[in-house]
Amino acid sequence: LGPSGIGKTTILRTIAGLENIDNGSIELKGKILSSKKTSIEPENRNVSLAFQENSLFPHYTIKKNILLGAERNNFKKDQSINFEELIDLLNISKILSKFPHEISAGEAQRASLARSLISHPDLLLLDEPLSNVDQSFKEEIQEKLKKILKNSKITTIIVTHDSYEAFYLGSKCGIILNQELKQYDDPYNVYHLPNSVEVVNFLNRGVLIPAEVTSPKSLENKDLGTITGNFIKPFPIGSNVKLLIQPEDLHHDDTSNLKFEVIDKKFRG
């Protein structure tokens, strides 16, 4: 998870063998894929990469494109994800006989995703897999994709700048800012326990207010007054800190004069 231009796609291309590395090594299941001295060819890594821009072959039908990965690698039927189930989950049954130029960008992206999944690789790399999917359909696809990945048990790395998507799909979440991995943790901790102001500002999921530590369990803010609670870690008395307040932390007090109307509620994982 990180902003555009930070190098997320380059990381995937490097793992897939499409870019060379300068230092270190890339290992998968104890096997060195890349190092300064050696590099296994991309087609021999059993790593599947779905690009952000669809990479469908224009002279093949969508069905042929999807099955190409499995046929190319000579996978047995029982090693692959069920074709019919995958087509149904991604809602692309009506475009199987069409060619890439006859379908929408969102349909092409889903077809590319199906092709990556069908061969059941050791490692699946998804670059902004749902960026071209219509917003009204995206949540449904996210839910289905999560189910597919869970059932297939394929290790998957997903690149996205959508924090909701990252938190919903991922069992772990890495935040990359300024070419550095700023935080790597489960989604709950990344969201509720961000480790820096940089991460908070990037996620944009709350408000930071300045405060002074006045006791082991209290802060003082000039506008809010005294704030009490249990700190995650101890701070010296008199320390200047920033308190993160997120929407979920706020509760309406029935004795308050504040009046409001709930317009919409949406569950996001």
Predicted regions and their residues:
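ABC ATPase nucleotide-binding domain signature
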Residues: 37, 51-55, 60, 130, ...
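ABC ATPase nucleotide-binding domain helices that frame the ATP-binding cleft
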Residues: 9-12, 111
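ABC ATPase NBD Q-loop/coupling interface
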Residues: 25-45
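Glycine/charge-rich catalytic "coupling/switch" loops of P-loop NTPases
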Residues: 223-266
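Walker A (P-loop) phosphate-binding loop of ABC-type ATPase nucleotide-binding domains
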Residues: 3-6
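Conserved coupling/switch loops of ABC nucleotide-binding domains, chiefly the family-specific signature
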Residues: 22-25, 178
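Helix-to-loop junction immediately C-terminal to a conserved catalytic motif
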Residues: 16
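ABC ATPase nucleotide-binding domains
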Residues: 46-48, 61-198
